[in-house]
Amino acid sequence: MKLEKGKAEERKGNMSKIFKNMIPYWKSIVIIIALLFVQAWCDLSLPSYTSDIIDVGIQNYGVEHVVPEALTADEFETAELFMTDEEADLWESIYEKDGDIYRLQVTSRSELNEIDDTLAVPLIMNYQMSAMEDSAVKEHVAKPTGADAGTLEKDTLLSMRDSMEETIDTMGSSLVKSMGAAYAVSCDKAAGIDVEKIQKSYLVTAGLKMVGMALMIGIVTVLVGFFASRVGAGIGRTLREKVFKQVVGFSNAEMDKFSTASLITRSTNDIQQIQMVSVMLLRMVAYAPILGIGGVLKVVQTGAGMGWIIVLAILVILGYVMVLMAVAMPKFQLMQKLVDNINLVSREILTGLSVIRAFGREKKEEERFDVANKDLTKTMLFTNRVMTFMMPGMMMIMNVLSVGIVWVGAHKIDAGTMQVGAMTAFITYAMMIVMSFLMLTMMSIMLPRAAVAADRIDEVIQTESSIHDAKEPEKVTTHNGVVKFSHVNFKYPGAEEDVLHDIDFTAEPGQITAIIGSTGCGKSTLVNLIPRLYDVTDGSITLDGKDIRNITMSDLRDEIGFVPQKGVLFSGTIASNLRFGKDDATDEEIKKAAEIAQATEFIEAKDDKYESAIAQGGSNVSGGQKQRLAIARAIAKDPKIFIFDDSFSALDLKTDAALRKALAENVKDSTVIIVAQRISTILHAEQILVLDDGKIVGKGTHEELLKSCEVYRQIAKSQLSAKELGLEESEVALNE
């Protein structure tokens, strides 16, 4: 029970995150809601017009009022039979005699409606009396037979009216108006008025009003779609911007927490889910209650007494949808994780395709992808199959609802308490109410998936980087490039043991500091601490005497030219990649950088030279060319500190030697830190650090380390001959 309550609260919290994203667009939302009220008013008016066309335009020849436009003198006198003295005075005041015809003088619709309400009962009774076969009854009650006979007959008529009025009160207002209009039509015909002309005029006017309403609905729908799409697009843009800014600020610790595939899914698929649902919320969810409540009010106005049918239909729909949701909802929540998984597998296969082919693992990887693909497909098929039951079920419920309304309505029409047009309007309103609930239930299925997406995005946005600028950072006043490690220890977040232990050295400008050691000894981890990709656990790193944690990351990284193990290029041109660290680098500067990096030859061989296109990830250049361009990019930045993280391993020995020579000649005043696997790369370094199991076990020049450091000597002997190392064979044998 507690678990279910916790899940409900979690879903509620996730939903609030969706609505929170919409707050900045409140002005557009207010406009949308106002437009939806206009649309609902138009939608709810159309059934009324349809009802009026049937009941008034067709049945009553377009006559809307109980009082006739004209009537004969005999009918004028007879109409007063069932009227009280006050009603008779009103009756006589609204007509003017024109020969043998009395013509109505009132034209105001509001006044006519008030007169209809006052005179409806006596006029309807008079109309019913006129339908009696024995027309002499009227003549008898109209003529006095003695001094008090007229009064006696009048009292009798009024008592008849009282008993008849009870029957009329049981009729609906539309039926009363219809009977009164029938009386007016009979009087108009007798007075020579062309009622067919009235009917045609009414039908044309009502039809034009319906066309106008339909056009208004179309315009409002387009406007709502326009504003809702703008809100959705704005939410998508804002979320992508927030996610991107947050991810760019992540340290390697946060990047390790979120996989690349998951971040891609969150910034694309998840945001699209929220964007789509935001639009649907504004177009459907906001409209559903407006339309539903309006439909209920219209149903109440009809006074048909069939509201129980709609209530029953809604209860059946809610029960039906709840069953479908209970079955499908867990799968909807699982779907996003499966999308993450298939993105992860796809990314690994595509990026590692050459390795897969080299090891002949195509079949195995196909099977791995098939497993991920089938898991997602099965889940989607399951949810789709469940959801396919929704529309047929809804249509069946709505059809049964229509049949029920027609069945009950037919009996009411037969009993004279309802009109055909009113029943038609009632069916339409019932469909609107049901559709409102249907829209809400459809969204209730889509919202949980979007809520999960919102939670996943919010998780990224709310994740604070473990590395951030100091509250009161120090300004970089000197730019010498002296890097000093003071008893640095480091362990990865969540790890129990240190990866680096008591690292203590100084890298001076104008010198090459090389770092060498076995695989996994912590070389790359060490240099990653300098640009603060990670922060030290203990100890400190200073730049020109200032702790790098007290310098803003932008200032710190402006001083560094970093070349990672794996050369990374961006889509664009060679020139745009070389200017990546320095936007205002001149053509001469990037050409000089390319020359130092030994990249000029292959660049000049291309048709477009420095404007040659670079594909995504640099896939259209070789590994060595990519690495040289990455080195040239760092050189073009002209930093005070160069960090080469095993950047020369992709180069042949000749290119490696030429590049190091050019580098030494052109960056004499900079601090150069090189992580290397090859001894030949660092032979002439002023300072070589030997790492073993995260500790510095040797420090000095090549010659000094050959004599003092066993680990370095073992690495050197594994790569170079005794002659190349400058050792005698006897020394090698002795050491062994």
Task: Show where each model-derived region lies.
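Transmembrane alpha-helical core residues of multi-pass small-molecule transporters
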Residues: 35, 39, 213, 217, ...
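Juxtamembrane helix-loop junctions of ABC transporter transmembrane domains
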Residues: 11, 42-58, 213-256, 260, ...
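Membrane-integrated ABC transporters
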Residues: 1-46, 50-211, 216, 220, ...
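Helix-loop-helix
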Residues: 294, 298-315, 319, 325-326, ...
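Alpha-helical membrane-protein architecture signal
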Residues: 11-19, 27-34, 205-208, 240, ...
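Short intracellular "coupling" helices and adjacent cytoplasmic loop segments at the cytosolic face
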Residues: 2-10, 58-65, 72-76, 84, ...
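An intracellular "coupling" helix at the cytosolic face of ABC transporter transmembrane type-1 domains
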Residues: 24-26, 160, 252-253, 269-278, ...
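ABC-type nucleotide-binding domain
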Residues: 2, 29, 65-68, 80-85, ...
